[in-house]
Amino acid sequence: MECLMAKLVPRLELPLLPNNIPSACHWDSSSLSQELDQWLISKLGITDESAKRKIVQSRVMLLACLMHPNGERDRVLLAGKHLWVYFLVDDILESSSREGYGALKSIVWSIATTGIYKASEEHDHHDLVLLLLVEVMVELRKEMPTSLFARYCKILSIYLDSVQEEVKHQINNTIPSSEEYRLLRRRTGFMEVMACIMTEFCVGINLEELVVNLGEIRELVKIMDDHIVTVNDLLSLRKEYYNGTIYHNWVIVLLAHDCATFQKSVDRVCEMIKQEEDSILDLQKKLIIKAKVDKNPELLKFAFNVPMAVAGHLKWAFITARYHGCDNALLDGELFHGTWIMDPNQTVIVKNM
């Protein structure tokens, strides 16, 4: 591990990432963002101004608006609440001890499937987050079609089991192989829920079970998951570098097993993002053709809308204070590139001349 640490340097060359998947943003994103931010700040009882600013500048509602631009307003708001709550739940799960994870896993599963959680009298941060999860899951269970919610729970079960495996790696200071990491992150990313199921819910797409299991759709789900995870790992690199969770990241996995230098590992991750985007666009075309040939309007809606979640996540990853620090003038909505200096407080980019 010490040898690996010696290869890490707090600066790298970041190329302009490909951004060719069609994208859009929900028409009411500004109002929705204010509504979600106020909801979270109120529910968590946050009074500190810097903490409020971090929530607002994390732009999580904007992520939902970019992922589901054609969704019904109330459902997109619920998707935004769901995103925020799972960011918080994921942080709690990943920071738990091996002994504590089992209990947390059971609580999260119980909340999702029954909507019941008995909080402690103190109502600490964990309790407040889990009570938020109760609120969101009760509403989701009420509004989501039964078959879609059943798919949701199936993927949630896989996610909870897989995060437990991730926690073991963190506790033992072990780094999985590239293929192990790819397969693990497909399960811990929870992106079939965030990108596919939530888009189907927000837009009102009704896929038959036979269509859900089409080879092209299953492959699209895997590659979309890969793209979102790879972008996440690259753009959250500064944050993870300073908070001590950097070992569970594509850049470090490749550095440990496949690449000789930090920069070569970054370059390889950027190549992966390009390859994943190309595959998504190819699969999207195939699904559009199939939908038209089969005269299946629901599949056509799926093919047009679901890949937007990937494009939306890419844009958000460049503008969120969650990765790049608060009050950062760099976050102007454009995909930045150049010499990336991983300052402890925020992302700094020196434009290459």
From Swiss-Prot:
Motif DDXXE motif, residue numbers: 90-94
Annotated residues for binding of Mg(2+) 3: N232, S236
Remarks, miscellaneous: Selaginella moellendorffii contains two distinct types of functional terpene synthases (TPS) genes, the typical seed plants TPS genes (SmTPSs) and a microbial type TPS genes (SmMTPSLs).
Alphabetized UniProt keyword annotations: Magnesium, Metal-binding
Gene Ontology biological-process entries: isoprenoid biosynthetic process
Protein name: Microbial Terpene synthase-like protein 30
Domain notes per entry: The Asp-Asp-Xaa-Xaa-Asp/Glu (DDXXD/E) motif is important for the catalytic activity, presumably through binding to Mg(2+).
Entry binding sites for Mg(2+) 1: D90
Domain of life from the UniProt record: Eukaryota
Cofactors: Mg(2+); Mn(2+)
A Pfam family that the UniProt record links to this protein: Terpene_syn_C_2
Cofactor comment text: Binds 3 Mg(2+) or Mn(2+) ions per subunit.
Function description: No terpene synthase activity detected in vitro.
GO MF terms held by the record: metal ion binding; terpene synthase activity
Record InterPro entries: Isoprenoid_synthase_dom_sf, Terpene_cyclase-like_2
Similarity-based family: Belongs to the terpene synthase family.
Native species: Selaginella moellendorffii
Binding site for Mg(2+) 2: D90
SUPFAM superfamilies noted in UniProt: Terpenoid synthases (SSF48576)
